[in-house]
């Protein structure tokens, strides 16, 4: 099993990696849809309530999603019944716990809703590392942009962020 804790250089994790769309929905989702269609992307994974809601609302259903059901805007995500399997995990802020990592391992197969008690933000890294070829991982940037990572192009570069995480010990 794998567990990581953000220990330093939090600033690197706030960087808006490509493809960053500084448009409100539905336009932001349309940009990602165009990208997905143009590059024959087969899998889309969303991390975060607002991004997941926008993708579902504007007709771009993700393969699997991770949400914590808490947003600064008080938004409720509709349409989560689309996902056949629900996995509940504990994941404190700044962590990717063993159980969250295991949930992402299942989620990359498709049809999974990960409900996080804590914070889901760091799970984007697990999705980027574990996603199959022709995948995009999408999440919201704290300044309001939609970030979509085509993993085939950026996986190696983004995985260097693991150098700034420390492995954590958890009780089984």
Curated annotation (Swiss-Prot):
Top-level enzyme category: transferase
- Return the Pfam families for the record: DUF359
GO molecular function annotations of the record: GTP binding; kinase activity
**Is the keyword Kinase in the record?**
yes
Q: What is its EC number?
A: 2.7.1.237
Sequence positions that bind GTP:
49-51, 68, 70, 120
Q: Which GO terms describe its biological process?
A: coenzyme A biosynthetic process
Question: Pathway involvement?
Answer: Cofactor biosynthesis; coenzyme A biosynthesis
Q: Which UniProt keywords apply?
A: Coenzyme A biosynthesis, GTP-binding, Kinase, Nucleotide-binding, Transferase
Known catalytic reactions: 3'-dephospho-CoA + GTP = GDP + CoA + H(+)
Keyword check for DNA damage: no
Q: Which PANTHER family match?
A: GTP-DEPENDENT DEPHOSPHO-COA KINASE, UPF0218 PROTEIN TK1697
Homology family: Belongs to the GTP-dependent DPCK family.
Q: What does this protein do, in the record's words? A: Catalyzes the GTP-dependent phosphorylation of the 3'-hydroxyl group of dephosphocoenzyme A to form coenzyme A (CoA).
Please identify the protein, giving its name as recorded. GTP-dependent dephospho-CoA kinase
Organism, per UniProt? Pyrobaculum arsenaticum (strain DSM 13514 / JCM 11321 / PZ6)
